[in-house]
Amino acid sequence: MKINRSIRVAAIVVTATIALGLAACSQFEPRDKRFYYRALWNFALREDLAELDSEFNGVDFGHSNLYENLLLTGGTDVPAIEDRARKETLAFIASKPTLNPNEEAIAPTYMKLAWRAQNTFDEAHALHRATYDIMVSNEPEKERAIRDVLAFYQESAYAITAKRLDHRQLDQFPYSKTFRTRFPLFNATIWSYHYLQVAVYDPLQAARDLAAKTRAMRPILATYRCYLAQPPVEWTFMPLTAELSPVFAARYPEIANIFDNLHMLHDNISDILASEQVPTWDAKRTEIYRIVNAYYLASADGKNPMVVNDQEHHH
């Protein structure tokens, strides 16, 4: 009789497992990450400008650590974000990581909530990394290499639009500015990351050799580290590529637009995760995917109301 009871219990467990699995299927998202663009210049930044590379590795940790903590604390616990999570991020940056971290290990909850949004970030971050590698490397045809990686990026279903978006309008949702208002220190820290990511382009392009590139990075890194120590809470909007690297933005306007749009999407998602106006995890996921699909992905270009005409510039 014990055998029959065990069989019944096992059947119940199997049935429950299948039911749970079927319920979860509606939320299942395949991990369809692409391999990075392969070239001889891969990892040139890591090999030749390791100091700058380690700072970017810290940036990767900061975004994921923030999103995970916003989710797990409900987005309202100021000490948990401004003190604990921010200090965790600063400690990781100070450790000078030699490799970029596994962001899914840092933010497993967020990755389950909004995998497609995270993969949108990952693809654009890979474009960042590729452009740095090309500029630091001894690649003789840098212009063509950059055009090639842009074309590779734009083949992705997760590619952010290369058109200029109206960032001011994208900052007018009902939940907009929640994050920077409630967490000004961490917000300014995030904007400091974005300063570093775009401020390096013009100096890297202008420097003729590795020694000159190394020298050119010193004042930018010094400024960035000052921002980490004393976050620029007086800033009212995120840094823009054309403001900090105007030569790069003029030469590669599509890439500059992608990076600015990427950074605006970071701000939107921070606001969604922090806002009580988007109260549940399901609601947050729905809103994140709504704005990604409607306003940020290149696949929406034909009907995206946030695209700015060439004659306009809304910043």
What is each of the regions a protein language model found here?
Residues 1-2, 303:
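...the same signal can extend to comparable exposed beta-sheet modules
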Residues 2-12:
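Bacterial N-terminal signal peptides that target proteins for export
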Residues 13-20:
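Core hydrophobic alpha-helical transmembrane segments of single-pass membrane proteins
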Residues 22-24:
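C-terminal motif of bacterial Sec signal peptides marking the signal peptidase cleavage site
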Residues 26-315:
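Polar/charged low-complexity regulatory segments
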